[in-house]
Amino acid sequence: MPDTLIVLIGPTGVGKTELSLSIAEHFRTSIVSADSRQLYADLKIGTAAPTPEQLARVPHYFVGTLQLTDYYSAAQYEADVLAQLEILYQNHDTVILTGGSMMYIDAICKGIDDIPTVDNETRQLMLRRYEQEGLDTLCAELRLLDPEYYKIVDLKNPKRVIHALEICYMTGKTYTSFRTRTHKERPFRIIKIGLTRDREELYDRINRRVDIMMQDGLLEEARQVYPFRHLNSLNTVGYKEMFKYLDGEWTLEFAIGKIKQNSRIYSRKQMTWFKRDKDIVWFHPDQQTEIMQYIHSVNH
């Protein structure tokens, strides 16, 4: 029987963490995180990282392994996770991958295009330009250099825009030319399970989760990482709103409201992305019995 990767997918706040723990305990296996922010050791509360108690229940990988200043790409994540899976499959025939970072999930399930590594000189040049000229200027430049990618990239995400320009400048080719979208075959079976809730139910959970984060000390966590606010790792819902409060631009009540609003918006983006994937079979998180039956029906 081939090794199996159970991929547990869903929007922020849907209930992936608790269900992934239950499934992992059932199979006596480990969990690999596919959350690009839970990688950072200093971002525990705002990323809803697994608690010490949850980490004690099931071994987790790719949680709290990076410093805020570390540069880490989806391509590096792909390489590191595939290497870790090879080790885990020596003792387990099933491993859980769970998270809401769409690009990280695709990196493991489908593979990342072989895009050249950006040299440090080009990276520093583009970061300086971003700081001095702003995102709008770089977006306009991307429109000229790679109009095809300009049409599909999230123009509000500086990391994506900057990276595309880095490739354009370093290679003299468009970023689009490297995006072959070739699906890489994996040496393990992939079972994709999506978790979903009614919108009103999900939004209520998101709102309550933000309130719990505030009670758990999100403001203090944001204050501790405030000196690093310019880093891409902190261009994240929960932290960027707290920074506005710490700057004196927003009241605390308004900042909390914006965290809730932006989290809801992000959940919609996640669902739009996930709905494109026809391999995902969808369940409500309370359907644990049906989920386990489905896994066993396809994993034999």
Curated annotation (Swiss-Prot):
Provide the site residues for: Interaction with substrate tRNA. Answer: S101, R123
* Molecular functions (GO terms): ATP binding; tRNA dimethylallyltransferase activity
User: Known EC number(s)?
Assistant: 2.5.1.75
> GO:BP terms for this protein?
tRNA modification
A Pfam family annotated for this chain is IPPT
Presence of the UniProt keyword Plastid in the record: no
Highest taxon in the source lineage? Bacteria
What's in the keyword line of the UniProt record?
ATP-binding, Magnesium, Nucleotide-binding, Transferase, tRNA processing
- For the ligand (substrate), the binding residues are T12, G13, V14, G15, K16, T17
Q: Does the keyword Transit peptide apply?
A: no
SUPFAM superfamilies for the chain: P-loop containing nucleoside triphosphate hydrolases
Q: Which coenzymes or cofactors are required?
A: Mg(2+)
Family classification: Belongs to the IPP transferase family.
Q: What does this protein do?
A: Catalyzes the transfer of a dimethylallyl group onto the adenine at position 37 in tRNAs that read codons beginning with uridine, leading to the formation of N6-(dimethylallyl)adenosine (i(6)A).
Query: In its UniProt entry, what is this protein called?
Result: tRNA dimethylallyltransferase 1
* Gene coding for it: miaA1
